Amino acid sequence: ELIDLGGEISKVVVGVVTECVPQEGTHLHICKVDCGEYGHDIQISTGAPNVYAGMHTAAALDGSTLPGGVKIKAKPLMGVESNGMLCSGEELGLNDDLYPGAEVYGLLDLPKDTVPGTPIQQVVGLDDYIFDISITANRADCQSVLGIAREVAAVLNKPLKMPATDYTVSDYVDSRLSISVEAEDLCPRYIGHYVRNITPGESPRWMRRQLALCGLRSISNVVDITNYVMLEIGQPMHAFDMDALESCQILVRRAKDGEKITTLDEKEFTLTPNNLVICDGSKP
């Protein structure tokens, strides 16, 4: 399936608020908005608390469409004609991973160099497409970008270009970390690498965006890298903080009946022996 990221949005453009006047007795502001070729003096009312004169934002004009099939029509608000709607990031289907600042309370505040009348898809990165490919359970080898590329190369009889790698192997991890596998029927092999001198922090925007488009939420640079590589080559990975591992040990085993685990998104799950867990010296 080919998904048009901005396909549900129509007639939403960059608008510059040239005038912003409070409407007496209401929480609204009556704005004059420059939308380039669509009109330089369009009157739109908004209740957003962060609106200001000079703001560049997303203007949904009369007859426009927003995600979810929402139709915008010119109509009076508190007795004053409003010829559209000024939009928040959420109303455009955005979050901070897709476009920084999208989750701010109020209107989407765009850079001052954005040109009035420009389709909003071009400004916030929604002028793009996603290939959504359904993979059957017996083709786990295709559940990655590399896997799909390998399949396409085979079908078209073309050479496969492998991802570039550049790394140096130092001492073996055995000297720092003990790894053992009890449930070999579920996990025939488990490999660990020890990486030093890492500073946890926020991932770059391009990586957060790529993960979001694949349905994953950005957590930190370390976690995001493991997820990004998993999507690229199909190898599931997890990063552990060595300082938090009890006894510097990793054990792969079946879960105990009723054992509980809390995931990175703070959700708790109750496990059964049919579940596989990765533990440190004492717990999953």
State each model region's role.
Residues V70, A74-L92, Y172-I179, L186, ...:
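Aspartic protease
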Residues E1-V169, V173:
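Phosphate-backbone binding interfaces of nucleic-acid-interacting proteins
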Residues V16-I44, R209, T226-P284:
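Conserved mixed alpha/beta core segments that line enzyme active sites in large multi-domain catalysts
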Residues I44, P76, G93, I135-C142, ...:
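Hydrophobic alpha-helical scaffolding
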Residues P116-I135, D174-L213:
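Residues forming anionic-ligand binding surfaces in small-molecule and nucleic-acid pockets
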Residues A48-T57, A137-A154, G215-D241, G281-P284:
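Conserved phosphate/anionic-ligand binding catalytic regions in large, soluble enzymes, centered on
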Residues D62-S64, G68-G84, S88, A149, ...:
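Conserved glycine-bearing catalytic or ligand-binding loops at nucleotide- and phosphate-handling centers
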Residues E90-E91, D109-P111, P200, P273-P284:
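Conserved catalytic alpha/beta cores of large enzymes that bind or transform nucleotide phosphates
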